[in-house]
Amino acid sequence: MAVPTGRALVFVTGNAKKLEEVVQILGDKFPYKLISKKIDLPEYQGEPDDISIQKCKEAARQVDGPVLVEDTCLCFRALEGLPGPYIKWFLDKLKPEGLYKMLAGFEDKSAWALCTFAFCAGKEEPVQLFRGITEGHIVEPRGPRDFGWDPCFQPEGYDKTYAELPKEVKNSISHRYRALAALSEHFCQDNGAPETKRSKHQD
């Protein structure tokens, strides 16, 4: 099932700031009109790719059309990748300060942020995955507290946290930017027919 250029693509999120950031990163060249929709999806468990695929399939079933689903992981090297895909619950309970304190007993404060966008053209269609990773460190929270764990993640090569960086700077280096760049390049090259060139990451 091809998705014609200009057709609406449902981005599954209830987070206005996330939608704003995604639209800003994608820019005018992205061939679809992005529409946000909050959908109640099961809280899947497992490896990041498996979670993304399951969520995207369920969203496509509910929407009965093309959907885009995002999953974000924050992975601490000292904890062998945890919290990983469960960062949402850790953040809800601990806040950025608590995430920082989790590594108090470890010398290694390094971490990586992983963003996975899953696209599905419709029910029964394969899921394509686009990933982005940004390396960094977990630091004592600094900056505005209005966007998740941004205050405690300092990207490699910068002396400011995600929260302290100007939006245009963050949006040019973030894990979300890298994943969206891969997605946008894939769709723009395919000129509105994402199914004609399969990603190797499909189910």
Curated annotation (Swiss-Prot):
Q: What top-level branch of life does the organism fall under?
A: Eukaryota
Q: Where in the cell is it found?
A: Cytoplasm
GO cellular component assignments: cytoplasm
Q: How is the cofactor bound?
A: Binds 1 divalent metal cation per subunit; can use either Mg(2+) or Mn(2+).
Disulfide connectivity for this sequence is: none
Offer one example of a GO biological process linked to this entry. nucleoside triphosphate catabolic process
Q: According to its UniProt record, which protein family does this protein belong to?
A: Belongs to the HAM1 NTPase family.
- Explain the purpose of this protein: Pyrophosphatase that hydrolyzes the non-canonical purine nucleotides inosine triphosphate (ITP), deoxyinosine triphosphate (dITP) as well as 2'-deoxy-N-6-hydroxylaminopurine triphosphate (dHAPTP) and xanthosine 5'-triphosphate (XTP) to their respective monophosphate derivatives. The enzyme does not distinguish between the deoxy- and ribose forms. Probably excludes non-canonical purines from RNA and DNA precursor pools, thus preventing their incorporation into RNA and DNA and avoiding chromosomal lesions.
Instruction: Give the protein name, as stated in the record.
Output: Inosine triphosphate pyrophosphatase
Organism expressing this protein natively: Danio rerio
| Gene that this sequence comes from | itpa
